[in-house]
Amino acid sequence: MSRKKPNILEHELVPKHEVLSVREAAELLRKLKIKPAQLPWISIDDPVVKAIKAKPGDIIRIIRKSPTAGEAIAYRYVVVDTLRPRKKEKV
């Protein structure tokens, strides 16, 4: 009998994560007057990043419930590895 993996996105403690479209990302960066790498990073190996199928270079919007503000929005830049960058493959 195979066991079905739980969907971590449905857990009550995991906030909503969504990948921004190219247009949304460009607008966000223009509004904040920053480059993507100036956002906080999130690893491509993060379980939620894998679940939403984000790719390196994507920007993720995280929407958390907040008791004081109602909701808090944060953004993360998806990188290959936040601790130890992988070496580029030789072509």
Swiss-Prot record:
InterPro entries cross-referenced by the UniProt entry: Arch_Rpo5/euc_Rpb5, RNA_pol_subH/Rpb5_C, RPB5-like_sf
Keyword hit for tRNA processing: no
Localisation per UniProt entry: Cytoplasm
Claim: Disulfide bond is one of the keywords in the record: no
Domain of life: Archaea
EC number: 2.7.7.6
One MF term in the entry's GO annotations: DNA-directed RNA polymerase activity
Pfam annotation, one family: RNA_pol_Rpb5_C
Catalysed transformations (reactions): RNA(n) + a ribonucleoside 5'-triphosphate = RNA(n+1) + diphosphate
GO cellular component, one term: DNA-directed RNA polymerase complex
Alphabetical UniProt keywords: Cytoplasm, DNA-directed RNA polymerase, Nucleotidyltransferase, Transcription, Transferase
Any GO BP: tRNA transcription by RNA polymerase III
Signal peptide as annotated in the record: none
Family: Belongs to the archaeal Rpo5/eukaryotic RPB5 RNA polymerase subunit family.
NCBIfam families reported for this sequence: PRK09570.1
Subunit and partners: Part of the RNA polymerase complex.
Role, per record: DNA-dependent RNA polymerase (RNAP) catalyzes the transcription of DNA into RNA using the four ribonucleoside triphosphates as substrates.
Protein name per the record: DNA-directed RNA polymerase subunit Rpo5
Originating organism: Staphylothermus marinus (strain ATCC 43588 / DSM 3639 / JCM 9404 / F1)
Lineage: Archaea, Thermoproteota, Thermoprotei, Desulfurococcales, Desulfurococcaceae
Gene assigned in the entry: rpo5
